[in-house]
Amino acid sequence: ATSAIQNGLGNQYPPGIGVPELRQAISDHQQRFYGLSYDPDSEILVTAGASEALAAAVLALCETGDEVVTFEPWYDIYGANIAMAGATKKVVTLRPPHYAFEESEFLAALSPKTRLILLNSPHNPTGKVFSRQELEFIAKVAVERDLLVVTDEVYEHLVFEGEHIPIASFPGMRERTIAI
């Protein structure tokens, strides 16, 4: 950092989409850990933090009258972002002790107004990591119903049991997923 500042690289705002080296590093990370290939120049955007990215995604994708499916408990910013977009939150409960959800409850939360699914795995605040089977189910429904998924994966490397699997890695999901 000191060298960058001394060489005049840290004296102004960065490019709006993020510095190229960081976008390339993010692309390399996704390829190395998950086999997902992203173009750093057209498919990666660096924000000031995950909360900003979540707000931008929900505000860009939702309009008044849309519905967003979330899993509760949830990170409190989700509700605020959905409300700011004029959308309605539809809740699917994660039940202890394993914080599993009922597929029937998930399906009941969907309607013709559903625009997107907001998924957080590893989950805050429970630490739950959605299983391959759960993600396959969500992905299948998203593809069948042409839904978008915004996935909050900020804790992807804080996994104590199981493994983190990005929903974007399932068939038909890469092009309908915004990963944070």
PLM features per residue range, with description:
Residues A1-G49, A56, E105:
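N-terminal small-domain helix-loop-helix segment of the aminotransferase-like
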Residues A50-S51, Y75, S121-N124:
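Short glycine-rich anion-binding loops that position phosphate/pyrophosphate groups of nucleotides
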Residues A60-I82:
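Conserved PLP-anchoring active-site segment centered on the Schiff-base-forming lysine
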Residues E72, V91-R95:
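Short beta->alpha connector loops at strand-helix junctions that form conserved
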Residues M84-K90:
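A short helix-loop-beta submotif of the ANL/AMP-binding
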Residues L94-E161, I165-A168:
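Active-site phosphate-binding strand-loop segment of PLP-dependent enzymes
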Residues F170-I180:
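Active-site PLP attachment segment
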